[in-house]
Curated annotation (Swiss-Prot):
Belongs to the glutamyl-tRNA reductase family. Gene3D superfamilies: Glutamyl-tRNA reductase, N-terminal domain, NAD(P)-binding Rossmann-like Domain. The lineage of its organism: Bacteria, Pseudomonadati, Thermodesulfobacteriota, Desulfovibrionia, Desulfovibrionales. This is Glutamyl-tRNA reductase. Homodimer. Its EC number is 1.2.1.70. Keywords: NADP, Oxidoreductase, Porphyrin biosynthesis. It comes from Maridesulfovibrio salexigens (strain ATCC 14822 / DSM 2638 / NCIMB 8403 / VKM B-1763) (Desulfovibrio salexigens). NADP(+) binds at residues 187-192. The gene is hemA.
Length: 439
């Protein structure tokens, strides 16, 4: 195999939110482009609130430390900080991990549907940038197929909750009931839309949507029967808001402790609850130090998630079995890639021999008409292909055996001398002398 497959990442289990936000990728396309310039053959990066993962296909001389060093440098961090918080998978372990991510078996909330959409979006961008090619294309399409199988053949999604649902459940734990409370969503993406739905179902009195693109805030507010808020007037509206759920894609905090100090004073110190489900975080952590202001981030949702976990454990076992099967299936395809150049060489050798023998035959026959020439050529080529049919079928079967691909490919290349090695004239002399005449 002349390539390696690596998947390097960090997630909610391996790193806290402070590390995740520091090494989040704010410009995935530029990140991928930089890796291609370093000599990586294919790359796709996924950056969400709970994980950053880099899938790479590269030549053996490019190593995992090379990729970590590039990642740390791009995020103005250090390998010494990044490495202890990451995990690295290679080969089929990388494939298996990707499949688990696609099925949301690796999510904070097992069975949640958002990750598949995020993965598809990352893949689309990698394709558009020319960063995803043969192997990543196949891996991602296979991962979508595996996710579909898991959702069709198990009930893992039926009891799943979303991050947005968990955020609203946390708000309920804080307030008891949400009737009469005024809520604001900062950000107008998919998570905000889901949060708005759950808040309305929980009986909030009023909901407002703040977004940098005001028209998007208006659209979501109209849909949800709420009001849109301009970012320019954000702090004025916070004075009248009890619950804030923030989920923008901003690379920096959008709520500062300095401004919130003024807001809480205007509220006469009535309690405010912020739930920040963005990574990088939207809300300055120092906000939590203000009187009667309570700030929770995405890592605080774990207790809500644990309550839902036991219902999905049996379904997760079934889902993991599907992942294992499809990972082995993908491994067979990878092995066939190693075999493909040898198959091409075999048929080229067969065609060359057929052409040589055809030329000799035509020379002996003398002048023949075009029809006879064509018939002889077809026969010569056909014999070559038919003679190779069984050896090629044998090779395909054998290379599907784990760990056997290189062994059988090497054997075939030597058997048919596809690399044009020079064979000594006396190579078989000893064998002839020792041969038993009775045999």
């Amino acid at each position: 195999m002349d390539h390696n497959i690596y998947l390097i990442g960090l997630n909610h289990r391996s790193a806290g939110v402070d590390v995740r936000e520091r090494y989040a990728l704010t410009n995935v396309e530029e990140f991928e482009s930089g890796l291609l310039e370093l000599g990586v053959r294919e790359v796709m990066a996924l950056s969400t609130c709970n994980r950053v993962e880099i899938l790479v296909v590269c030549a053996p001389e490019i190593t995992q430390p090379n990729i970590l060093e590039y990642w740390a440098k791009r995020c103005c961090g250090s390998v010494s900080e990044l490495e202890p918080n990451t995990y690295c998978h290679d080969g089929l372990n990388a494939v298996k991990h990707l499949f688990r991510v696609a099925c949301s078996l690796d999510s904070m909330i097992v069975g949640e549907p958002q990750i598949l959409g995020q993965l598809k979006d990352s893949y689309r961008k990698a394709v558009e940038a020319g960063a995803a090619r043969v192997i990543i294309n196949r891996m991602l399409h296979k991962s979508f197929f595996v996710a579909k199988r898991v959702r069709t053949e198990t009930s893992i999604a039926s009891s799943a909750v979303s991050i947005s649902y968990a955020a609203v459940e946390l708000a309920k734990k804080i307030f008891g009931e949400l009737e009469g409370q005024r809520a604001m969503l900062i950000g107008a993406g998919e998570m905000a839309e889901l949060a708005a739905t759950h808040l309305l179902n929980s009986g909030v009195e009023q909901i407002s949507i703040a977004n940098r693109t005001y028209s998007r805030a208006e659209d979501l507010a109209k849909c949800m029967g709420g009001s849109a808020v301009s970012f320019d007037n954000l702090y004025d509206h916070l004075v009248e808001t009890d619950i804030i759920i923030s989920s923008t894609g901003a690379p920096h905090a959008v709520i500062s402790a300095k401004e919130m100090k003024k807001v809480i004073k205007k509220r006469k110190y009535r309690p405010m609850f912020f739930i920040d489900i963005a990574v990088p975080r939207d809300i300055d952590p120092d906000v939590n130090g203000l009187d009667n202001v309570y700030l929770y981030d995405i890592d605080d949702l774990k207790d809500v998630v644990e309550e839902n976990k036991s219902q999905r454990e049996d379904e997760a076992i079934k889902a993991n079995s599907i992942v294992e099967f499809e990972t082995l299936s993908f491994g067979n395809w990878i092995n066939s890639l190693d075999l493909q150049p040898t198959i091409v060489d075999l048929f080229n050798r067969s065609e060359n021999v057929a052409q040589q023998e055809l030329a000799k035959t035509l020379k002996r026959l003398g002048d023949v008409d075009a029809k006879t020439h064509k018939a002889l050529e077809t026969m010569a080529m056909s014999i070559g292909k038919k003679l190779l049919h069984e050896p090629v079928a044998f090779l395909k079967r054998r290379t599907e055996e784990e760990g056997k691909a290189d062994e059988f490919v090497d054997l075939a290349r030597r058997m048919f001398n596809l690399d044009n090695e020079t064979i000594p004239a006396d190579a078989h002399c000893g064998r002839k002398k020792n041969r038993n005449p009775e045999n």
